[in-house]
């Protein structure tokens, strides 16, 4: 079914399912890697990924990058603006060049003028001119003889109109100029113009009209524009006169003329195939320098001169290169001169002056040089900062085990049995009384719960113990008493009664605690008492040896005085134990029904194998107590004693041992910080909870006294 469903599913669904499966597998792998697999807290579990945090070095690197990029970007923008400014200064000031031959003919003051005759014929153009001429009388020659005529002196004011060139078919003939109106002045005789005809010129000229009777006919003049020599409307110059060649002065018939001024048109004239035109060297104008008062007429260092003509004198200016106009007041772009003669200019003429150009080039060069220097400094600073950042990152990678605490350390150390350092936690809690007794009989029980720092040695008596990590009482006691004691899993810590006091420090040990007198009903004798020896790794060694006890019974209860030798000694003091006699003042017997608060010594890794050999009454029994962590065996010889007395002695020994251990552990804890330790002590007094260090060490006597005073104050506060 599943295979069929898979086959029936579309490919998109299959791919989606495969993708989801892959994602699930990846997520499971990631979770296993993060948690260390199923055994997340095991020894071989992988460490959780370190939390990513924003490093200051990374941020600083980014800031340095932007600090270097932004000035470079601004510098390039400034460079572009500088180049644009240079282009605007150099190219923007140069006007666009327009050739003069493409300018409209009606424009004013745009074409340059020439004060000398051209060296070549003008271009073939037909020009219509309006002239005012004075003709001299001519005498016609008879019989076809050639006649000569005097040159005409013509003063013209010209306006040129450009037309398309006109050519005669079949031969080279210059374009003719036909005067539209001719006025004869001071004519003494009828003015006649001989017309020479030739077979070659049999056709009439364009625009010619038949002669009107009574009007003089003018000779056909060479057809080249006179306006080419005087095109400026402001220039009043005389046009050059010319004479016809002898080939053109052939005999012609003339018509009658009248003395009145009439409009004439040139007749059809014939001439040989080849003809030439000669210019006259005579001129009617005179060039004179301007007077001193007229020197300011020409601007921009132009040269002023006066032209005298028949109509009067006229002032003109010869402008310097780069200027034009009537008074040289118009600036001519220098591109004209560059285009006309580019070999004489090297590009510096684009500027108004060479100094300005040099200043601008210098300023732009300084800007570019400054930008390059700033870029170099930024690059050097960037690489230096990058190197320093790498060094800082390498220093940060050095492990700092003393400053970091791992959350996984406690679980890992709890499961590893070979680790020396471990966290020992002291848990205090109160237990409700089983039977209604007085306040003096209330007990506080506490237990050490913590990881074992050392391997355990199997004990044959482990099966009879109720709790694994606690020692059992001596097997000498009765089953009723043992059942009343072994139901607890922690030792009892009894607050001192109003009559109980802590004695002063006698040597390195505490004095015996005083127990209040409580009447007891009956006693049950028992054999032997346990004697224990603490391991040498802890900061205290306890040797307990009891002397033979004398049993005394009374009607009200059991009262006895015993001498007990107890020594509590720091390991750094001496290696051999010594004993101090302690006077047992008041020992109180407990009944089997009220023996529910007998403390059990904690086993902070302490397991002992006790082999007891009970003997007969009045005979000493030998008990061999072997430490589970040391191979030495303590041989203790004790007499046959009462079980109640043994219980009382054991209670006292255990109380002193626990108090000494608590004092030393608390002292080691407070050595790091006294103030913090005092706060923790108050919290432990109120909440019955305290945390002990990994491996406690012995401290100085001054610290021990300080801790002792705090303990006394706390006990007195609890008693009140």
From Swiss-Prot:
Residues 28-48, 119-223, 246-280, 451-481 are annotated as: Disordered. Keywords: Cell membrane, Disulfide bond, EGF-like domain, Glycoprotein, Growth factor, Membrane, Secreted, Transmembrane, Transmembrane helix. Residues 1-360 are extracellular. Disulfide bonds join 290-304, 298-317, 319-328. Residues 149-163 have a biased composition (Polar residues). GO terms for biological process: chemorepulsion involved in interneuron migration from the subpallium to the cortex; ERBB4 signaling pathway; ERBB4-ERBB4 signaling pathway; intracellular signal transduction; mammary placode formation; modulation of chemical synaptic transmission; negative regulation of neuron migration; pattern specification process. The chain crosses the membrane at residues 361-381. Residues 34-44 have a biased composition (Gly residues). Signal peptide: none annotated. Proteolytic cleavage close to the plasma membrane on the external face leads to the release of the soluble growth factor form. Extensive glycosylation precedes the proteolytic cleavage. Isoform 3 is glycosylated. Residues 382-720 are cytoplasmic. GO terms for molecular function: chemorepellent activity; growth factor activity; receptor ligand activity; receptor tyrosine kinase binding; transmembrane receptor protein tyrosine kinase activator activity. Residues 127-148, 187-205, 250-271 have a biased composition (Low complexity). PANTHER family: HEREGULIN-NEUREGULIN FAMILY MEMBER (PTHR11100), PRO-NEUREGULIN-3, MEMBRANE-BOUND ISOFORM (PTHR11100:SF18). The cytoplasmic domain may be involved in the regulation of trafficking and proteolytic processing. Regulation of the proteolytic processing involves initial intracellular domain dimerization. ERBB receptor binding is elicited entirely by the EGF-like domain. Direct ligand for the ERBB4 tyrosine kinase receptor. Binding results in ligand-stimulated tyrosine phosphorylation and activation of the receptor. Does not bind to the EGF receptor, ERBB2 or ERBB3 receptors. May be a survival factor for oligodendrocytes. Interacts with ERBB4. Belongs to the neuregulin family. This is Pro-neuregulin-3, membrane-bound isoform. It comes from Homo sapiens (Human). The gene is NRG3.
């Amino acid at each position: 079914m599943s295979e069929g469903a898979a086959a029936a599913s579309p490919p998109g669904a299959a791919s989606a399912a495969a993708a989801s499966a892959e994602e699930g597998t990846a997520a499971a792998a990631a979770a296993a890697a993060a948690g260390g697999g199923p055994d997340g807290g095991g020894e071989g579990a992988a460490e959780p990924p370190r939390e990513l945090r924003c490093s200051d070095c990374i941020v600083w690197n980014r800031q340095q990058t932007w600090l270097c990029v932004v000035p470079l970007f601004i510098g390039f923008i400034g460079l572009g603006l500088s180049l644009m400014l240079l282009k605007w200064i150099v190219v923007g000031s140069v006007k666009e060049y327009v050739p003069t031959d493409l300018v409209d003919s009606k424009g004013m003051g745009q074409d340059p003028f020439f004060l000398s005759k051209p060296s070549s014929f003008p271009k073939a153009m037909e020009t219509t001119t309006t002239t005012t001429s004075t003709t001299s009388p001519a005498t016609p020659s008879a019989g076809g003889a050639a006649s000569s005529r005097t040159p005409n002196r013509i003063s013209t004011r010209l306006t040129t109109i450009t037309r398309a060139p006109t050519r005669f078919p079949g031969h080279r003939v210059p374009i003719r100029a036909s005067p539209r109106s001719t006025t004869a002045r001071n004519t003494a005789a009828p003015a006649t113009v001989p017309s020479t005809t030739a077979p070659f010129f049999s056709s009439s000229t364009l625009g010619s009209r038949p002669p009107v009777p009574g009007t003089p006919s003018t000779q056909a003049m060479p057809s080249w524009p006179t306006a080419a020599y005087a095109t400026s409307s402001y220039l009043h110059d005389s046009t050059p006169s010319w004479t016809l060649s002898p080939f053109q002065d052939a005999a012609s018939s003339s018509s009658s003329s009248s003395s009145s001024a009439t409009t004439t048109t040139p007749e059809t004239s014939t001439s040989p195939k080849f003809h030439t035109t000669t210019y006259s060297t005579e001129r009617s104008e005179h060039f004179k320098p301007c007077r001193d008062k007229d020197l300011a007429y020409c601007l921009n260092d132009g040269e002023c001169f006066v032209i005298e003509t028949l109509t009067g004198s006229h002032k003109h200016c010869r402008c310097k290169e780069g200027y034009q106009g009537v008074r040289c007041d118009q600036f001519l772009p220098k591109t004209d001169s560059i285009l006309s003669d580019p070999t004489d200019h090297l590009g510096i003429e684009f500027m108004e002056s060479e100094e300005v150009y040099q200043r601008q080039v210098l300023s732009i060069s300084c800007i570019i040089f400054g930008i390059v220097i700033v870029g170099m400094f930024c690059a050097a600073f960037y690489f230096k900062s990058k190197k320093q950042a790498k060094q800082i990152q390498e220093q940060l990678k050095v492990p700092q085990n003393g400053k970091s605490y791992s959350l996984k350390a406690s679980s890992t150390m709890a499961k590893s049995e070979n680790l020396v350092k471990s966290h020992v936690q002291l848990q205090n809690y109160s237990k409700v009384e089983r039977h209604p007794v007085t306040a003096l009989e209330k007990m506080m029980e506490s237990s050490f719960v913590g990881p074992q720092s050392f391997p355990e040695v199997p004990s044959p008596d482990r099966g009879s113990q109720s709790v694994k990590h606690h020692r059992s009482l001596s097997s000498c006691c009765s089953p009723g008493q043992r059942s009343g004691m072994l139901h607890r899993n922690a030792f009892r810590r009894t607050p001192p009664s109003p009559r109980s006091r802590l004695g002063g420090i006698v040597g390195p040990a505490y004095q015996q605690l005083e127990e209040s007198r409580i009447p007891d009903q009956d006693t049950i004798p028992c054999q032997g008492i346990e004697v224990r020896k603490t391991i040498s790794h802890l900061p205290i060694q306890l040797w307990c040896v009891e002397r033979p006890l004398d049993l005394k019974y009374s009607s009200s209860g059991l009262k006895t005085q015993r001498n007990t030798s107890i020594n509590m000694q720091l390991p750094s003091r001496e290696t051999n134990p010594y004993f101090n006699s302690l006077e047992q003042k008041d020992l109180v017997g407990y009944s089997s029904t009220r023996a529910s608060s007998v403390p059990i010594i904690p086993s902070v890794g302490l397991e002992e194998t006790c082999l007891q050999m009970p003997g007969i009454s009045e005979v000493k029994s030998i008990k061999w107590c072997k430490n589970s962590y040391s191979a030495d065996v303590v041989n203790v010889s004790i007499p046959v004693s009462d079980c109640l007395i043994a219980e009382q002695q054991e209670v006292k020994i255990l109380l002193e041992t626990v108090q000494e251990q608590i004092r030393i552990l608390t002292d080691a804890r407070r050595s790091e910080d006294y103030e913090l330790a005092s706060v923790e002590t108050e919290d432990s007094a109120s909440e019955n909870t305290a945390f002990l260090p990994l491996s406690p060490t012995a401290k100085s006597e001054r610290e021990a006294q300080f801790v002792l005073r705090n303990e006394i104050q706390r006990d007195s506060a609890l008693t009140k």
